Regions:
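Acidic, surface-exposed loops and disordered segments
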Residues: 1-156
């Protein structure tokens, strides 16, 4: 498949089959993605592959923390404090499309929470890839990191 085709067919998957994933395939994907460019070859990315009992334990801990009201600390602000156009409209449309597809009503807070918790289970994928970068890396490393992540997705 051409890269342009892969990009055009891109989708966000929020449900996975309970199928075994070949760990060697994951290694091949990550090794291919390591060829992504990075400023002065810093290669700031780190990846943890989590599966089996360790994945179940991590998922349970994350869900328990979330449902207990424990808030994690971000090393950086991901979203703006206040949304402005056109981003506000795009965000709202995306949420509406997702919740409509999942048949979650606006007033059904319990189902909304359950859907959010699915994030912490990696949407039941058999393997979870956790991506890290040292917190002392500068803003430019986010660009390197993004190219690595895109390479992982294209290699997959």
């Amino acid at each position: 498949m051409k890269v342009s085709e892969a990009l055009a067919k891109r989708k966000s998957t929020r449900a996975f089959l309970n199928k075994t994933v070949d760990v060697e395939k994951i290694k091949r994907i990550l090794n291919a993605a390591k060829q992504a460019p990075s400023g002065v070859n810093t290669q700031p990315w780190q990846v943890a592959v989590v599966m089996g009992e360790k994945k179940k334990l991590l998922e349970q801990r994350l869900e328990n923390a979330y449902r207990s009201g424990i808030k994690g600390q971000m090393d950086y602000q991901y979203y703006p404090c206040e949304w402005h156009e056109p981003y506000k409209t795009r965000r709202k449309a995306c949420g509406l499309q997702l919740y409509t597809a999942l048949e979650i009503n606006r007033d059904d807070k319990e189902k909304q929470i359950d859907q959010w918790v699915a994030n912490y289970r990696a949407f039941d994928a058999p393997i979870m890839l956790l991506f890290f970068m040292d917190s002392d890396m500068a803003t430019g490393s986010f660009l390197d990191y993004g190219m690595f992540l895109q390479s992982v997705m294209l290699a997959a």
